[in-house]
Amino acid sequence: MTGVRVKDGESFENAMKRFKKQCEKAGILSEIRKREHYEKPSVKRKKKALAAKKRALKKMRKGF
């Protein structure tokens, strides 16, 4: 769970910025987007295979 304690003399904007940064680092927003709608296991497998294929093509282009 992400939490931020506001320091003495710290503005709300700075505290909010730190909170957003911690949420992004923890991957909370991406997890929420991923769980927003149910995704069938077959669709997950297809997406995973497509992502692997893209990574392989990217590596080939770089020359690794």
Curated annotation (Swiss-Prot):
Gene3D superfamilies to which the protein is assigned, alphabetical: Ribosomal protein S8
Keyword Nucleotidyltransferase carried by entry: no
Q: Name one GO cellular component term.
A: ribosome
Q: Which domain of life is it from?
A: Bacteria
Please provide, alphabetically and separated by semicolons, the GO molecular function terms listed in this UniProt record.
Answer: structural constituent of ribosome
Q: Name one GO biological process term.
A: translation
One Pfam family this sequence matches: Ribosomal_S21
Protein name, per record: Small ribosomal subunit protein bS21
Q: Which HAMAP family match?
A: Ribosomal_bS21 (MF_00358)
Q: Which family does it belong to?
A: Belongs to the bacterial ribosomal protein bS21 family.
Q: Keyword annotations for this protein?
A: Ribonucleoprotein, Ribosomal protein
